[in-house]
Amino acid sequence: MFDLKATIGRLAQGQTLGRQDAWMLFEQMAFGHASHAQLGALLMALRVRGETVEEIVGAALAMRARMVPVKAPADAVDIVGTGGDNAGTYNISTCAAFIVAGAGVPVAKHGNRALSSKSGAADVLSALGVNLDQTPADIERCIAEAGIGFMFAPTHHPALKQLMPVRVDLATRTIFNLLGPLLNPAGVRHHLIGVYSRAWVEPLAHALGDLGSERALVVHGSDGLDEITTVGPTFVSMLARGRVRSFEITPEMVGLVRANPAELKGADGKWNAVALRRVLEGQPGAYRDIALFNAAGGLIAAGVVENWPDAMALARASVDGGAALATLNRLVEASQPEGHVQPY
């Protein structure tokens, strides 16, 4: 029988857990067998000592076994960040997701409301008019009709609901920042994942491989962003054909001018929604450049192109031809309940 108190003691002493022990620990958490005090102690013990790949893989397997699944095409991609970079940018990966979907790649996006920032994916999508109260069948219809669907994390991970107050009270990064991108309810095997620390770029790529992903880019900007950045170099680890290779990319490599960090700042969900829509409408500037760069990464992760110039060209065509904006409008419409009349 799994001993939760003994495991807390082991973690408090700085010991690491194997994959099986991590799986059992997070299964206990998922079944609600840990008090809020125990949850806080576990999360902070892992945070202070530093999580391991084995712990993350074990935890992900436990959480995946309890999630509410969604069916998506085999070539679907997710574009998501861990959060926790404290950069306060606008919703870059959400904007990039519409560009990728506009380029013809199905997107099954998984996300949440803001925990450590002003605007999470759910906040900006809600402000754009997307209905978040959807069943798995509703989301599957959105992917079929609009080319993109959004899975609101609390709906698909009921086991995590009791953790939400603890995470909010802690108000700091925990293992769940790293786990979130690995818990896509559609089981996507293609990913662009931004992480809050360079130290996690390569380990998370290996974790994805251990979890069965086929192709992924894990990225961290040299300016601290959990995105592909236009401020400077981006550190990348790419999973493909069962192997991980690491490299750097820069804005200049794809014909972009470096941005000032202040040019990428955002605000709350409503403000960011306006900014995102303007990018999809074709407005030039730093917001557009970084969205295109991340969309290019998403297209490479999806496997539709192999090099960055071709990926950038495809991303630009998605925006400039109107497909990305049309994708947003279709998602807003497709996500509404039957009988709803969308205002214009």
Swiss-Prot record:
Mg(2+) 1 binds at S93, E227. It is an enzyme of class 2 (transferase). Its cofactor is Mg(2+). Mg(2+) 2 binds at D226, E227. Binds 2 magnesium ions per monomer. Keywords: Amino-acid biosynthesis, Aromatic amino acid biosynthesis, Glycosyltransferase, Magnesium, Metal-binding, Plasmid, Transferase, Tryptophan biosynthesis. GO terms for cellular component: cytosol. Anthranilate 2 binds at R167. InterPro entries: Anthranilate_Pribosyl_Tfrase, Glycosyl_Trfase_fam3, Glycosyl_Trfase_fam3_N_dom, Glycosyl_Trfase_fam3_N_dom_sf, Nuc_phospho_transferase. It catalyses: N-(5-phospho-beta-D-ribosyl)anthranilate + diphosphate = 5-phospho-alpha-D-ribose 1-diphosphate + anthranilate. 5-phospho-alpha-D-ribose 1-diphosphate binds at residues 81, 84-85, 89, 91-94, 109-117, 121. Anthranilate 1 binds at G81, N112. Its EC number is 2.4.2.18. One of its GO terms (biological process) is L-tryptophan biosynthetic process. Homodimer. HAMAP family: TrpD (MF_00211). NCBIfam families: trpD (TIGR01245). Catalyzes the transfer of the phosphoribosyl group of 5-phosphorylribose-1-pyrophosphate (PRPP) to anthranilate to yield N-(5'-phosphoribosyl)-anthranilate (PRA). This is Anthranilate phosphoribosyltransferase 2.
